[in-house]
Regions:
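Extracytoplasmic
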Residues: 64-66, 100-102, 192, 223-225, ...
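Bacterial N-terminal signal peptides
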Residues: 8-16
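Flexible, glycine-rich surface segments
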Residues: 173-240
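Bacterial N-terminal signal peptides that target proteins for export
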Residues: 1-8
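Zymogen propeptides
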Residues: 20-161, 239
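Conserved, well-ordered active-site substructure
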Residues: 116-137, 141, 212-268, 274-310
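Short acidic-glycine loop/turn motifs at beta-strand connectors
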Residues: 72-73, 145-154, 199-201, 230-234, ...
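Active-site neighborhood of phospho(di)ester-bond hydrolases with catalytic His/Asp-centered motifs
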Residues: 106-109, 266-270
């Protein structure tokens, strides 16, 4: 019942917000931050408090200012996913769930423009043709999936190599990968275009600005952030940090909060109004402005059949 007054406020504010969106570039930074923080609270109220019991190997992580999931590679598989329609993550999750009943969750993916995705994407060992992708010549971060035919391995890393060259020549030059890779490991999936927060358990978030050339306006530096992190047990965390936390504060939380067990590496992907998490057909993290703006790419989570547990 507590949600209804908040939703009533949304109905009153939406005409003002969307009328003002035409001049958002000239909007006073303090006003923009205040509006964003208001909608952050509203989206939290809209997010479901009744997520069903989750399958083994998937746990909800929730601390003030951050929600997400912790994934155990023994029980789940993750896969980059793309779509070309102008629909959000919830609609795409619904479509996938009609085809594969094992789908459990999804989080928004890499940065995008009207032309396509701004990062490398590989799905099932191939370049998806549903969307265009543009990878920067500047070395950016990625989440990757390798397989030796029997076991899959999740990694975080950095490369400036295009998807086609990655499939042809592999990771060469100045690429980084946070876990050992053998000659038997084949690249199955990749979601790129991100920036560093933590590497080898150290805070390296300034590299995203100084070396990886990310340019966030000051007012957007503490907007929402979509974050992928790995711990010493090779578990993957898919997270959204709410407005108010910049990369420095996110790094501090990941390295200091007991809910995050010895994080070794963390990267960010597209954030702001794109940051969204869907779990079991409900929003664990609802869209910032209550309009699902996740587009083109995402990371989907599927439960494994019990016989597949390794």
């Amino acid at each position: 019942m507590k949600k209804y007054p908040l939703l009533f406020c949304v109905c009153l504010l939406c005409p003002l917000i969307f009328a003002g969106s035409r001049v958002s570039a000239a909007m006073d930074p303090d006003l923009k931050a205040a509006i964003r923080n208001l909608f952050s609270g509203l989206s939290d109220a809209v997010a479901s408090e009744e997520i069903a019991v989750l399958p083994d190997g998937i746990d909800v992580v929730s601390i003030p200012g951050c929600k997400g999931l912790r994934l155990d590679p023994r029980f789940v598989r993750v896969q980059p996913h793309v779509w070309s329609e102008s629909c959000g993550l919830m609609d795409e999750f619904t479509k996938v769930s009609m085809i594969d009943k094992n789908v459990v969750a999804a989080i928004n993916g890499t940065f995008y423009s009207t032309q396509g995705a701004l990062g490398q994407i590989i799905v099932d060992g191939k370049i998806p043709h549903e969307i265009r992708q543009f990878s920067s010549r500047i070395s950016r971060c990625f989440f990757g999936i390798f397989s030796d035919g029997n076991n899959k391995k999740w990694v975080l890393g950095e490369t400036g190599i295009s998807s086609s060259n990655l499939l042809k020549d592999g990771f060469t030059g100045k690429s980084r990968i946070n876990r050992p890779i053998t000659t038997n490991d084949k690249l199955e999936g990749l979601l790129g275009g991100g920036g560093w927060i933590i590497r080898e358990s150290r805070d390296v978030h300034m590299e995203a600005y100084n070396r990886q050339n990310f340019r966030f306006r000051k007012v957007d530096q503490d907007s929402r952030h979509t974050v992928l992190a790995m711990d010493e047990l090779n578990r993957l965390y898919i997270l959204v940090f709410e407005s108010g936390a910049n990369l420095s504060k996110i790094s501090e939380s990941l390295r200091g909060k007991r809910e995050f067990s010895r994080i070794t590496d963390a990267v960010f992907l597209d954030g702001g109004s794109s940051s969204t998490i869907v779990v079991m057909g409900k929003y664990l993290v609802a869209p910032l402005y209550l309009i699902d703006k996740a587009r083109l790419s995402a990371l989907f989570v599927f439960k494994l059949p019990p016989i597949s547990h390794k």
